[in-house]
Amino acid sequence: NIARLAVTAGLTAALSFGGVMAPVSMAFAAESATATTNIITIKKNENNGDVKYKAYQIFKADVVDKDGKRVASNVDWANGLSETVRTDIIAAIKNADKSGELSNDPSAQDVADWMATNLQDASQVVNNGDLLDTIASLVKGTTPVTPKGASTAAFAADISVSFDNSGYYLFLTDDDSIGTADSYSGKKQTGTSPIFAVVGGSAVEVTEKTGIPTVTKKIKDDKPGSDWADKADSQVGQNVQYQLTGTVAENVASFNTYYYEFRDELSAGLIADNNSVHVTVYANNEDTSGTEVNLPTDAVEYNTTGNNNVLTVKFNNLKAVTAKNGSSAISITKDSRVVVTYTAKLNPANTEKVTVGGTGNDNNVKLIYSNNPMSGGKGESVPDTVRDYTYALKLVKEDSVDSNTKLKDVMFTIKATGADELEPGKVGTQYVHENGSLGDDEYRFRTNEKGEINVKGLDAGTYTVHEVEGSNPGYNTLDDFTFTISTVKEDGTDSLKQDERQNELTVSASKSNIDLVETPSVNNGTITLTVKNKKGSNLPLTGLNGVTFTWIAGGAVLC
């Protein structure tokens, strides 16, 4: 029977789905045919983690190579396929659009012929709900085939395995080799869409049908002309923009539901505004407009209990999201990009946990996603981190003659006269407050016993320091002076745009009394400014026995 000497149906479909492109035709198995080796190698996606696979045989057949063609004979149901599963496969086919072409009581050969005729143009990635997806779900419940010489059915990627019997096989990712719904931390793997392949004749090599979702995080500095980057700097209390961009699995079409979660961990000194969250789906990399998502009520959560500071944006089924305007369904394909934007700030109510300089206030995100179209497992992406930097000022007030004499209780105001990110109309009008934030009301700093003023949470920019008149009795009032914090280095490059974690700062001071304001220094994000005060002058007088006249801050006092 010529029909039983080749499996045009099973082979053609298998070669399409399994990625094996050798020509197949109906032919006799002759004496000169190459004997079967039953070897297959499944190549792992280069970005996938360690995974294993299991094989399930659907049809058994004698398979050989002849004249560059793969030839099969004696097609029958595999021994491991129960009568119930065979019946269910036939029922699934009869429910298909072209089921009328299948006889009422079909043989294995009839089923193989039908598959070849109706499925040979199918996509290499099996779509959820397609007939092959249904068949894969039915066959997965059977006992997997153990490779030759192995003690277990699961086998690793990128190695050749062989089987006792040739024929038509289904290959699936071993559920135990990837993350589950409850245990996925650090498991950066995804499962393949069903792979259908013919094993026999020459060795077969296929590549798993999957792709690893990725996530990138960016932060935008409000300095004019800034773009999304890995680093920014800001004032305490200033809202800073963040962006998360996630991709989906290459085989997302194979999933019935697709769990998708951004888990964003903020360092202790940061606080997010969960009401600022927006999610937009872009069709592909060329799509610049996107479609904003109508967020479910439980999509955004913000947990700040204990040591946690976690913002989550999650979808129990990303494939079911709708547009914010109009509620129409948004198509999720392998090319889709999911973008989350929100704002966060260095917390003015928790400045003791704000990091000055160093490696900044880090903020990292990871993606948690459905990892297997054939099970309910989850995987976890490689995390991505951005950093928000802020700086501190240590102003030291001392006597101009004796540097060991520190001046206590001297008052100063610090005005942001050129900070990078001041709102329009606010430049030169806002004052630095005790916690480093900016406000419209004047705030007066007072030197401590060490003659110091310490304030952290400053952004890059220019600040004007003003000594309050009369707050330093016995000394002349210091003229106003400015200092400038910049991330632009002497060679003109901006350290905010470079990869190294720690920023290089350039600090300068502009002053009229050049000998009273020392050149500022920088150490790990803290700017030290030493300012000196001269004592008032004792002028010689005549005619006033026992009385001196001292000039103080432009006024005269009798002593």
List each model region and its residues.
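Solvent-exposed loop/turn and edge beta-strand elements of beta-rich ligand-binding domains
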Residues: 2-559
